[in-house]
């Protein structure tokens, strides 16, 4: 195990601590709810859903967080402005945990950010994300909200190397006019969750994971990813699982451990239904990391899985 010379920044988002030296704080886990095709949704555009089933899923994630000591975030996805506002209203009432405001639509993301600001949920809200594709209207609208936390996505298709990812955060790498960190700061963001933007196997997945070391060495900011998307894009596994279904969850949940072992502070582990698999697996990795880091001067916090599960 390793310890960074750079002082590590620990964010406090509504009482949830994200960051620190490997082995110090437990990995924060985020499960996605209301994603495209989610069975609990009755109308994706209008945001009509089964509230009992949604509550049960969030409470299960909450329960697993209590059991293992790994804090949780509710990754709240919405296809439209109308839908995401309804989802956030529900999530805000049903749990005290932080939540991601997530959508493929910039208009929906902003609607979510504005809603969170209007009703006093801004301290729990994390924007997903400030990235190279964000246009001026979205950034200006984000600036006018009260949000202070955001994922900053290190995706650089022009240069998917470690240097290219660092560059897109730092100065735009010649692809955009300014670095993503400066763009985020201009929007009032001062709590950066650095997403290394993991791409498919053979197309930079390993490089993205290695970027985790670079981020924490250079800035000390919390780092993580939605690394579970890698198995989803693996053609061989998609074919193999047709006859061997048991292989899929092993790779899906297991991918998160790779991000953890590279110094990751948070993982977006995929569908919230996977909470009962993801939390024990990630807690186990945290125990390994904490035990290994103890000999080099890193002490785990009191509610770490190392103390809760041993």
From Swiss-Prot:
Coiled coil: none annotated. Pfam families: MtrH (PF02007). The keyword Methyltransferase applies. It comes from the Archaea. GO terms for biological process: methanogenesis, from carbon dioxide; methylation; one-carbon metabolic process. Keywords: Methanogenesis, Methyltransferase, One-carbon metabolism, Transferase, Translocase. Transmembrane segments: none annotated. Pathway: One-carbon metabolism; methanogenesis from CO(2); methyl-coenzyme M from 5,10-methylene-5,6,7,8-tetrahydromethanopterin: step 2/2. InterPro entries: Dihydropteroate_synth-like_sf (IPR011005), MeTrfase_MtrH/MtxH (IPR023467), MtrH (IPR028342). Signal peptide: none annotated. Induction: The last gene of the probable mtrEDCBAFGH operon. Its EC number is 7.2.1.4. The keyword Ubl conjugation does not apply. One of its GO terms (molecular function) is tetrahydromethanopterin S-methyltransferase activity. It catalyses: 5-methyl-5,6,7,8-tetrahydromethanopterin + coenzyme M + 2 Na(+)(in) = 5,6,7,8-tetrahydromethanopterin + methyl-coenzyme M + 2 Na(+)(out). GO terms for cellular component: methyltransferase complex. Gene3D superfamilies: Dihydropteroate synthase-like. Part of a complex that catalyzes the formation of methyl-coenzyme M and tetrahydromethanopterin from coenzyme M and methyl-tetrahydromethanopterin. This is an energy-conserving, sodium-ion translocating step. MtrH catalyzes the transfer of the methyl group from methyl-tetrahydromethanopterin to the corrinoid prosthetic group of MtrA. Belongs to the MtrH family. The complex is composed of 8 subunits; MtrA, MtrB, MtrC, MtrD, MtrE, MtrF, MtrG and MtrH. This is Tetrahydromethanopterin S-methyltransferase subunit H. It comes from Methanothermobacter marburgensis (strain ATCC BAA-927 / DSM 2133 / JCM 14651 / NBRC 100331 / OCM 82 / Marburg). The lineage of its organism: Archaea, Methanobacteriati, Methanobacteriota, Methanomada group, Methanobacteria.
